[in-house]
A protein has these predicted regions:
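Active-site region of glycoside hydrolase catalytic domains
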Residues: 2-50, 74, 93-95, 103-479
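A common structural microfeature
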Residues: 18-20, 63, 80
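Aromatic- and Gly/Pro-rich amphipathic surface segment
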Residues: 40-76
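Catalytic domains of carbohydrate-active enzymes, especially glycoside hydrolases
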Residues: 65-86, 300-304, 375
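Glycine-rich, proline-tolerant flexible connector loops at the mouths of alpha/beta enzymes
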Residues: 85-98
């Protein structure tokens, strides 16, 4: 995991002319209308209703408000938008019957994007497997892999004239970890490392099959996958136990998935660590020879990698039992992550954190990008598909002064430019999020957007960060 920092001078202030300045969304977090217009159920519907904490309806009412949001994109210099297609809005049961109203909705949405000169970057799965497939085991069941490939192929054909940039999955690590380690997603399993690894492998196999369907189908455009990646640092760089803890989680979150993406298999050191960690929870990982044949072939056709990065992690050795608590309220200091066999997340003195205990250390993005370039020289291009800062965003006198978010974005963009200076090919940056949205585990009090959303009236108000980003996007400079 070592990175050899190349000599870095002051970064160039200028972004390339073709650099994408984007904003990101996800269907379930913005659309609303989760049980109308023919949409089928997903596991989140009943899961959130049973919790009773918050509802995904109406979220940002993007299903009805998207013309407003895309007009704002054009006004504020945002020339790319990450969207996801809700699988169950197209196939209500995951397979079989098609919902024509859902199909037409995305045609209309993509047309509106192009009307406002905003390029859609489209994800096919963003934590929202249709309920009938989820109940059969989600991606631990290989039938879901085939169903996903059928859904993906339908979308490739249906929207071929409107979508150029495709992503198969959003954040395979987050899907696996929140379902099988932290237990904050539907299913709620905690600290089962073998199932987390199996989920990662099976989703990467589904990605590979979809990439081959895209390539062999002769579709125009480009395709890749979005991985949620965090650089891991040992708290004490001279302590072998801390170094091992950092490497354990690095393999679990980063290296296992990146090997699958760019090698199409798993390097011996990756597989040794993965098998050792899976055994901690009493399980094994099923990796078939035919899986690797498919993955190796697909690895040739990844046009880009989407990197979602908000923070890095500092780890120290931990020998106790599992102790996990998700900070879903913004009460600073309440989050805990101690996993048997891996290690413990800790804060480093002098490094700031958000109210949700997320670390603010933009150098971590630089180290991560350089690591990818060094270990996987066959990568072609990277997009920063999510980066941003959750903030409570007080609305006062018709305005939101979110200077901490501006500072966060600016620092990360400067380190991004440093990575580009040393040869990392980055094609664009998407803020999470375009507008304030529903959060899977935080509801509505954790805001990320450029545009403040009054969830009662659905009125949009540009924040200070939107005006700052507009200047950067239009001048392509960091002053």
């Amino acid at each position: 995991m070592s990175v050899n920092p190349t000599s870095v001078t002051n970064p160039p202030a200028q972004f390339p002319e073709d650099f994408v300045f984007g904003g990101a969304t996800a269907a379930y977090q913005v659309e609303g209308e989760t049980r109308t217009h023919g949409k089928g159920k997903v596991a989140w519907d009943d899961f959130l209703e049973a919790q009773g904490r918050f509802s995904p309806d109406p979220a940002s009412d993007f299903y009805n408000q998207y013309p407003v949001d895309l007009e704002l994109c054009e006004e504020f210099g945002i020339n790319g938008i990450r969207l996801s297609i809700a699988w169950s809005r197209i196939f209500p049961n995951g397979t079989g019957e098609i919902n024509p109203e859902g199909v037409q909705f995305y045609h209309d949405l993509f047309a509106e994007c192009h009307k406002h000169h905003v390029e859609p970057f489209v994800t096919l799965h963003h934590f929202d497997t249709p309920l009938p497939l989820f109940e059969k085991g989600d991606f631990l069941n290989r039938e879901t892999i085939d169903a996903f490939v059928d859904f993906a192929t339908f979308c490739f054909k249906e929207y071929a004239d409107q979508v150029t940039y495709w992503f198969t999955f959003n954040e395979i690590w987050a899907d696996a970890s929140n379902t099988y380690i932290e237990g904050t997603f539907p299913g709620g399993v905690k600290a089962h490392l073998a199932e987390a690894f199996q989920c990662e492998h099976n989703m990467m196999l589904a990605h590979a099959k979809a990439v081959l369907a895209f390539h062999n189908g002769g579709f125009k455009g480009k395709i890749g996958v979005i991985q949620s990646l965090e650089f891991k640092y040992p708290l004490n760089e001279n302590d072998p136990a801390d170094i091992k803890a950092a490497n354990n989680e690095h393999v679990l979150q980063n290296q296992f998935l990146l090997d699958a993406t760019f090698r199409g298999d798993y390097a011996p050191d990756t597989l040794e660590c993965a098998n050792r960690l899976a055994a901690v929870s009493g399980g094994t990982i099923e990796i078939l020879d035919e899986d690797l044949e498919i993955m190796r072939e697909a690895a040739l056709y990844n046009d880009y990698l989407g990197v979602n990065n908000y923070q890095c992690r500092f780890l120290k050795a931990y020998d106790g039992e599992n102790d996990l608590h998700h900070n879903g309220t913004g009460e600073k200091g309440t989050g805990r992550w101690r996993v048997k066999g891996i290690g413990e997340h800790v804060n480093k003195p002098g490094v700031p954190t958000t109210d949700w205990d997320w670390i603010i250390y933009p150098e971590g993005l630089f180290d991560l990008l350089v690591y990818i370039k060094q270990r996987y020289p066959n990568y072609k291009q990277i997009f920063i598909t999510e980066n941003g800062m959750g903030y409570k965003d007080p609305y006062k006198d018709g305005f939101v002064d979110d200077q901490p978010r501006i500072d966060y974005i600016e620092q990360h963009l400067r380190w991004l430019l440093k990575a580009m200076e040393v040869g990392v090919n980055v094609g664009g940056y998407f803020l999470w999020s375009l507008q304030d949205q529903f959060s899977w585990t935080n509801g509505y009090n954790k805001r990320y957007g450029f545009f403040y959303v009054d969830f009662e009236t659905q009125k949009r108000t540009p924040k200070a960060s939107a005006y700052w980003y507009k200047h950067v996007a239009q001048t392509r400079r960091l002053d």
